[in-house]
Structure formats: structure tokens, C-alpha cells
Amino acid sequence: MKIKKYGSLLFGLSFVLASCAGPLYSPFYEKAISGTEYITSVHKDLTSLPPPEKQVPVAVYKFRDQTGQYKYSTTVTSFSTAITQGATAILIKALEDSGWFIPLERENLANLLQERKIILQMSQQYNDDNLKETALKILQPLIFAGVIFEGGIIGYDTNIVTGGFGARYFGVGGAVQYRVDRVTVYLRAVSVKNGAILKTVQATKVVLSQELSGGFFRFVRLNRLLEIETGITSNEPVEMAVQEAIEKAVHDMIIEGVKIGMWKPKDPEVFKATIERYEKEKEEALKRLKSAGEAEFWGVR
């Protein structure tokens, strides 16, 4: 009877953990997949913006992690960075996906210039008129950018909110814990014509980590102890949080640029609805800050 009783308790505990762990992320895959696995909640807003009057050539030299933070560890010292070092590639992809910009290769400009130099040197070395003519046709003038996008990841705050809950009754129980981090991105548009900073935008994304655990602890008979533990942890990838923050910054930069005349939409009347939604979102965010008591801390009145 005792075995049946404990079996029922174990089954109930397993059922609770399975039902709670359902929405958690499952990391198991059989093979690599094509394309992106993670589509951010901002990506649809970015790609569904009304089209521009014409695409704007822009340059991105470096969009760096400026936090200098290493991965948090409670046991050993880690020399792995907490933030992805590929933010430049993420920004270029976001600019490309928006449909508003023509990103130009500037991060590895030396490689591009070296390859063009090789083509010219080969045509001169062999003194072949046909080869020279072909080289001149291939090597079109490089496109210059009117705007440079600068900025970087300027903040990564860990453990800004932590908490949990647990309960145990006669050796049977479980617990849930969570931790909230935050990543902050700044993006600015710089005029190539005169070096003026045209606009600066900021985007913030929280990173959620959660742990669910359960256990069973009972003496089933004399000197016979039954102990079972199980659990699962879900950590939102920091890279995906950075991607979402960058996409949000690009989305906001497009709208702010339209407002001050940096670039123009194809249909200004259609774009007015986008600006209205954007302004409403900013007002709601400000209200949330004030209601949370953070407005004075950030200097918002």
C-alpha cells in the first residue's frame, strides 16, 4: 500500500512539473536548421513598415559591445563575454530587413579594397587589353553613404529583479525561481556631409531566466530513504535579446527620421498611422515608468 501511495505522489508531482514546464524552451534538435530559429516580437513591426520613397545607402563600421562585462558565474571566473560580439552583423541584417536602407560593407572594408586591387594588378601585369576592359566593367565605383550608423550596446544589468516561490509538505514539494536582466542599446545617425548627429534612439530589452524544480523525500521503511529530484531551467538567450533591442532601435530610427525629414516614405498619409501608433506606444511606456516609481530615477517628469 505504501508503494502505491508513494507512486501516486510521484505521479502527481511529475504531472505538475510537466504541465508547468510545457511552455519552457526545449533545446533539443536533431540537425541544423536553415534561416533564423528565433523571430523577435519586433521583427514583424520592422518589416511591415510602409515602404520608403527610395532606399538610403548607409554605412555601419562598428556596432560594439561597450559594457565590457563577462558572463556571470557564482563558482569560477569566466572570461567569456556576457554580450554577443556580433552586434554589427545583427544591425546590418536589421537594416536590410527593414527595406528602408542599403547597407554598405564597411566593417571589413580593407578586404573589399584588397580584392579590387588584385583585379586591377592582374590586368596590368598581363597587359591584356581584353582583361583590362573586363576589369573596368567589373569594378564599378563604390557607393558612398550619406548616413553612418554608430552606437553600441551600452548596458547589461544583471539581477535587477529576482524572486521565487516554493512549498513542501511531508517531504513532497517544488519551487520556482526567476531572474530578470536588462540590455540597453543606443543607435545614432551621423551625417557624412557635416558630421552632425541627426538623431539618437534608445531601446531596452529584459532577459528572463526561470527555474522550476521539485522533489520527493521520504523514509519508506527503516533505514530506507527514497529521494527524487527533478527540474528544468529556461534562460532567454542574450543574443536574441540584443537582436530584439537592435531591431526596435532601427524601427524607432526610421520613424524618428521621417518625423525630422531625414528620409521620406512613399506615401506620407499611410505613414501617419505608423507615427500615431509609435507616439501612443511611447506614452504608454512613460505611464508604466511613472506607475512603477522609476520616472524620477530616470529624470522623467
Residue spans of the language-model regions?
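Short alpha-helical segments and helix-capping/turn motifs at coil-helix boundaries
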Residues: 2, 41-45, 133-135
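Bacterial N-terminal signal peptides that target proteins for export
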Residues: 1-10
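Charged, amphipathic alpha-helical segments
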Residues: 154-171
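C-terminal motif of bacterial Sec signal peptides marking the signal peptidase cleavage site
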Residues: 17-19
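C-terminal/domain-edge helix-coil "capping" segments
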Residues: 21-54, 157, 165, 176-301
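Extracellular loop and loop/strand-boundary signature of outer-membrane beta-barrel proteins
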Residues: 136, 171-175
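N-terminal segment of the mature soluble domain
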Residues: 57, 61-159, 184-186, 190-200, ...
